[in-house]
Amino acid sequence: MVTREPLETFSVPIGPQHPALKEPGHFLISVDGEIVTDAVVRLGYAHRGIEKAAEGRNWVQNLYLVERICGICSHIHATAYSLGVERLAGVEVPPRAQAIRVLVAELERIHSHLLWLGVAAHEAGFETLFMYSWRDRETIMDALEGFTGNRVNYSANLLGGVKVDVGDEQRTAILKALDYLEPRTHHYMDVVTTDAL
């Protein structure tokens, strides 16, 4: 009779197509018992040719193109592009426009974090946390819509500035959303770190 030692070290391949992945990607996770010892990530399965598409457009048209790289984080792509073009052209963006770009980016970041918290909760089978985080994400999306006029591609950037301004009504709506979300995020942190699920 042949006896073997239990295999403690092994690799777990995930992807490129997997129900838990929202975008195609290949991950090779090496584990030693319960400890992840290495991870190899291979992306690029969803290459869309943005670079090639940009070659045939002008500077302004490309701003709209890069906004559509990702529906969740459209503003930050457009901001990065705008900053690059502005630096190349030697254009200085007014401080208020810089502040507005940061405000939209931070609201977008909160929206993204709540979205992915919900996705992670859903994949872990924690449907209540999924529903709560997506419900609360709507407060940020509503604030962004009231601020920029759009819920997905905010289209707030112009080369050299921004298309939107913050008035009293927008400021009040944004602060109200943030006041609502602050205790909720602390609650989510408690749920994620202490819940027995």
What annotation goes with each model-predicted range?
Residues 1-197:
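Active-site bordering "gate/hinge" segments
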